[in-house]
Amino acid sequence: THTVWAFDGYTANPADYPAFRAVADFNTTHAAPGNTTGWFMPSAGQLWDVLEHLGGVKALADQRTNGDQEWYGTDPGNDICASLNRWLAHVTDAAKFGDSYNWFWSSSEYSGNVARLWRVRSDGYVYCYWNSKGISRDVRPVLAF
């Protein structure tokens, strides 16, 4: 998957992808440590790794070679939102994952108006599919060391 690392190099109109603009704005209001990449919107593959390893979604391990356009799976008994929140102990409650479900964008683009979107639920369901960039969903900026 492709990750757009720097807003400065993005040639499309940022208004066409509000999630990308949100990450650029986040960089201006939340200083990243100097020894990091700075905040960026992760690719679908990077989010896959976060969900599998930090969210404990074992069902993703079985789908690593799945080439489907859209994918969903279930990990019964895994409250994915709570699993992810355990890694967010030092952030405000408002910035944590909600109690029942969450949607969030990736930087993986299919076309000028479509990008990869993830949805996770507290009942163990996880979805990954393409959707219109104009839809209002959350974005989870990350940084790398």
Regions found by a protein language model. Name each.
Residues 44-48, 53-145:
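C-terminal, surface-exposed recognition/capping segments
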